[in-house]
């Protein structure tokens, strides 16, 4: 099994909470990925804007607390307008082209639960076009009482299994 790298946006809403200990009672998708018993994350590339640096620092510290074996790599991506499709796609494409992907050695999951809808669509398109050579990762909270660990699903975009 190859080392696993997860790439995903900091959720400025979903990952946010009060900065005290009660944050551990809430599902935060980015942190919850690294709390999964059946998913070992070797590296987490956390995409975030400068305006969310404080939240990014807290989330990175929390990932290190729950998963000390996970290397957390912050990646600053600033958008003038995070809802501008062209800007978001272009900056994510630049990120993808500059990132040292090595799919022969590492596996990649692209987290699409956080970020604006525009960012989620762009991540999907870049993964589908293999600029991001991985599978999609989707997370969601568990039903019932609030708890920090949710569910996760891996989505492969290889549609050849549907060929007749």
Where are the language model's segments positioned?
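Long, low-complexity, Lys/Arg-enriched
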Residues: 1-109, 116-164
């Amino acid at each position: 099994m190859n080392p696993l790298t997860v790439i995903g946006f900091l959720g400025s809403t979903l990952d946010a909470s009060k900065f005290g200990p009660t944050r551990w009672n809430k599902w935060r998708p980015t942190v919850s990925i690294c709390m999964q018993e059946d998913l070992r994350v070797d590296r987490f590339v956390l995409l975030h804007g400068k305006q969310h640096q404080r939240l990014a620092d807290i989330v990175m510290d929390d990932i290190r607390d729950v998963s000390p074996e996970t290397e957390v790599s912050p990646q600053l991506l600033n958008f003038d307008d995070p809802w501008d499709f062209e800007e978001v796609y272009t900056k994510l494409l630049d990120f993808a082209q500059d990132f040292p992907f090595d799919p022969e050695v590492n596996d990649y999951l692209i987290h699409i639960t956080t970020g604006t809808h525009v960012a989620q669509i762009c991540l999907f398109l870049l993964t589908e076009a293999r600029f991001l050579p991985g599978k999609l990762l989707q997370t969601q909270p568990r039903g019932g009482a609030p708890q920090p660990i949710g569910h996760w699903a891996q989505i492969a975009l290889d549609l050849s299994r549907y060929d007749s």
